[in-house]
Amino acid sequence: MNWTLLLEQTLNGFQFGILLFLLAAGLTLIFGIMDLINLAHGSLYMMGAYFAATLTKWTGSFLLGAILAIPACMAFGMIVEMIALRTLYTRNHLDQVLATFGLILFFNEFVRLLWGPIGLDIPLPEVLNGSVELFLGIRYPAFRLVIIAVGILVAFLLYLLVSRTKLGMLIRAGASNRQMISALGVNINFLYTIVFGLGAALAGLAGLMAGPIMTVEIGMGEGILIITLVVIVIGGVGSIKGAFVAALLVGLIDTVGRSFLPDILGLFFSNDVADTAAPAISSMLIYLLMALILAVKPQGLFPPRGA
């Protein structure tokens, strides 16, 4: 067993899980409170990356560009909610799926018109561009450690927001009983706009942190959206705690599985069979995990109270 590789892949799994959590936290709130299936959530992840790339170029600072990109993405999401999504709340889920799928196509063409078809890069400052020595001589990219730290901080702040504030009380109540908060005289449209904006900001944060380690390109949010939906189902729709735990589980299993499954299969089969089967099986691991968890807990690991 290569313990150095295992540690590196475990950290990579945590880093991937953190990005999944940021996407899943916003999307699970949107669906849990607004009962809206938003397939275009991955497009907000893409917009966050493009906003960060542009603002970093304009300001000459990645940190300043990232700070400005988060409220920009939140404002963008709130505008989208008010213009394009508000009429979908009374429609069935099939209509929501079709409409938000159309938004994916719209956002892709919108980005193509504004930024062109060629991908962008987000340059990192020198302090984040190197690696950090952890222990026993193991070095790990500094920016990936920053992603993990920022994700944990955001998870803690979300916990405080949801559990200790008036807005959080409304969010918890809305996730459990939307009719109740409406009967109490809460401005539902305003709450929905705030929740959607918060979800857009989280998606944008994930996008701007993913941008420096991959190409910022059209359609970059579509693949990760599918895994995000798996995270939400595993964790429990509407549950921030569930999204966090499930995201880390999925991130670790996906990353570590892809790295070590060929070697594990090689212990029982020939190298040719192991090399052929490992990619297919590794891509199935998170879906097998979802099936196993749903067989035991049909509402996910941590469903909201009253669900």
Label every model-predicted segment.
Residues 1-22, 51, 59-65, 91-96, ...:
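Membrane-interfacial amphipathic/re-entrant helices at transmembrane-helix boundaries
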Residues 60-62, 66-71, 193-203, 207-208, ...:
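Transmembrane alpha-helical segments in multi-pass inner-membrane proteins
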Residues 16-17, 137-221, 240-245:
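Helix-loop-helix "hairpin" substructures at the membrane interface of multi-pass membrane proteins
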Residues 11, 33-79, 83, 264-274:
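Membrane-embedded helix boundary and interhelical linker motif in transport proteins
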Residues 60-104, 110, 245-250, 254, ...:
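Alpha-helical transmembrane segments within multi-pass membrane transporters and channels
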Residues 5-55, 83-95, 179, 232-240:
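Single transmembrane alpha-helix segments in multi-pass membrane proteins
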